[in-house]
């Protein structure tokens, strides 16, 4: 996942949220560093089937006017380069991405459409005072098509763990990435 992506609409935002994953830490069961799915970062806290939880957010979206629905963004502070190091400096510099999101919602900056959502133009990020090599910026916003095809298959398997529930709307976004 790139450093930041804007959902194309509410349903796409629910799709993005339903597919959040993170590396396990010492505080979570399983192998430290292993990637695990944690929809909406709510899996340990949700007291009912996640499919119903996804359905709730889709229903909320149906009640929103298109022009007034909140914008949804997903961030990836922890993307690693091919050498295993973090590409983004993180910590206080994350505010630079939040600044871009605020300017995006205010209509001050535009985006590039991609198969996974709307991406910022790198020149619209405030990078004053930090040294992020051009190659790292390119990798931060690159989309590996083959990896996304694999991810789409894993997403299908993940959704299936919640039982025989129709994810027509969410699965429509999944196929766009292929």
Give short role names for the model-derived ranges.
Residues 157-159:
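Extended, highly charged clamp/arch subdomains and adjacent linkers
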């Amino acid at each position: 996942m790139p450093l930041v992506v804007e959902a194309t609409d509410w349903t796409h935002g629910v799709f993005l949220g339903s597919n959040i994953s993170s590396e396990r830490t010492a505080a979570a069961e399983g192998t430290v560093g292993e990637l695990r799915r944690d929809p909406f970062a709510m899996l340990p806290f949700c007291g009912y089937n996640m499919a119903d939880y996804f359905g709730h957010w889709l229903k909320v979206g149906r009640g929103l006017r298109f022009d007034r629905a909140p914008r949804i963004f997903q961030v990836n502070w922890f993307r690693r380069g091919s050498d295993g190091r973090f590409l983004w400096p993180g910590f206080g510099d994350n505010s630079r991405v939040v600044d871009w999101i605020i300017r995006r919602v205010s209509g001050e900056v535009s985006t590039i459409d991609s198969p996974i959502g709307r991406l910022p133009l790198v020149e619209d990020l405030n990078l004053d005072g930090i040294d992020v090599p051009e190659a790292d910026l390119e990798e931060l916003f690159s989309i590996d098509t083959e990896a996304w095809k694999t991810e789409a298959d894993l997403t299908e398997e993940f959704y299936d763990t919640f039982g025989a529930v129709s994810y027509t709307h969410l699965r429509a976004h999944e196929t766009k990435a292929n």
